[in-house]
Amino acid sequence: MTCRTRFAPSPTGYLHIGGARTALYCWLEARRRNGQFLLRIEDTDRERSTQAAIDAILHAMDWLGLDYDEPPVYQTQRIERYNQVAARLLAEGKAYYAYDSKDTLNAMREAALRTGEKPRYNGAAREANLPYRDDPNRVIRFKNPHTGTVAFDDLIKGRIQISNSELDDMVILRPDGYPTYNFAVVVDDWDMNITEVIRGDDHINNTPRQINLYHALGAPLPTFAHLPMILDEQGAKLSKRTGAADVMQYRDSGYLPHALINYLVRLGWSHGDQELFNRQALIDLFQINDVNSKAARLDMAKLGWVNQHYLKTDDPATLAPPLVWHLEQRGIDVSAGPAPTDVILALRERVQTLKEMAEKAEIWYCPLQRYDEIAVAKHLKPGAETALLHARTLLAALPAWTVDNVDTALRTTATTLEIGMGKVAQPLRVAITGTQVSPDIAYTVYLTGRNEALKRIDAALIKISTA
């Protein structure tokens, strides 16, 4: 049987980090087994579902490279199908109409709570065989078995069993003809021929109800795998503040999609002590039943380390487009400065994110705005002008503006003046960047460009003379 998995987000918000991990695990399991990965948009919550959220989910999936093998399925386009299946269950005596008012249902709930019981529907309409009537309270309820147990072998959690006596007759169709979650997902997974249902363990309590529906419909039962939740770094439930952000906010913060994928897969799964995987290695090695049943903890330091690894090792040509995007987000005209690939080579060892790289790269694309006064006091003081003037003369006369030529000019300055290279590099570094810290001084000057470098040296000389 062909493996078919699905990711089924509700478009009531963005794709968060937990949803992205679920999508990744579904995608990997399907790819490893040469199966199909499908996307279903569970958009029946008409008050909260939005097209903007749908677009955001699709955009995030595309950014992560989680491609799906068939067009997305939208639940709102399948309302007729849900009604057909509900009608079949009615005709077979496996479901029934109920017309209980909200007050009646609230009274049932309060009575159960007073006696310390679990709130549940009391089945008042189960045997009444009530006919259809136009009523705002009309629902269709599924006749859950009263006896026996529901058991299944979860690929992650192991054997799970529950008595049917703990389950009530759930609503499957609302008065407006829209399905409830538990009903819709069973019909969808059946129609989509899903063989493995991989989802968060917040759905584990729904599974026995769904299994009974599968049996009532005579539908083949998929295999279930319920993923443990992701906790924040303190071991608490994730919030927007502690990491449960829109996946695209990770992009905006400067993380690479393949770095995030590499990090996410390790939040619950491992292959020995190996930390870094390319995509094909993940496809070859990942197995859903190897996922740990315990909750994973977010570790932003580890994500930064993984991201920096790829910044250091990826081809600069592949890193250039996302770096340009980050520079443009800062209002920078990239055509006014050095090639992005050169910037990447200069900064890749010094940063963990593309956002940080773009911030540091501003010195090569924008006029120098300010000086670090501590750096000025230490390095742009009387006497420093000698090295700056000598370096300026050689830089202005270079036949070609290359890193090697710039480096030669600076070293020649140190040799000619019989001073250490630091006496040349540090005043020049402050003159060019306004700070005491930068990449290799020759590369820093080269990326600034001849005209801008000379202009900044002149400004530093004026600053020294007026100190």
UniProtKB/Swiss-Prot annotation:
Pfam families: Anticodon_2, tRNA-synt_1c. It comes from the Bacteria. InterPro entries: aa-tRNA-synth_I_cd-bd, aa-tRNA-synth_I_codon-bd_sub2, aa-tRNA-synth_I_CS, aa_tRNA-synth_I_cd-bd_sf, Glu-tRNA-ligase_bac/mito, Glu/Gln-tRNA-synth, Glu/Gln-tRNA-synth_Ib_cat-dom, GluQ/Sye. GO terms for cellular component: cytosol. It is found in: Cytoplasm. Its main location: cytoplasm. GO terms for molecular function: ATP binding; glutamate-tRNA ligase activity; tRNA binding; zinc ion binding. Its EC number is 6.1.1.17. ATP binds at K240. The keyword Transcription does not apply. The keyword Cytoplasm applies. GO terms for biological process: glutamyl-tRNA aminoacylation. A motif ('HIGH' region) lies at residues 9-19. It catalyses: tRNA(Glu) + L-glutamate + ATP = L-glutamyl-tRNA(Glu) + AMP + diphosphate. A motif ('KMSKS' region) lies at residues 237-241. Keywords: Aminoacyl-tRNA synthetase, ATP-binding, Cytoplasm, Ligase, Nucleotide-binding, Protein biosynthesis. Belongs to the class-I aminoacyl-tRNA synthetase family. Glutamate--tRNA ligase type 1 subfamily. Catalyzes the attachment of glutamate to tRNA(Glu) in a two-step reaction: glutamate is first activated by ATP to form Glu-AMP and then transferred to the acceptor end of tRNA(Glu). Monomer. HAMAP family: Glu_tRNA_synth_type1. This is Glutamate--tRNA ligase.
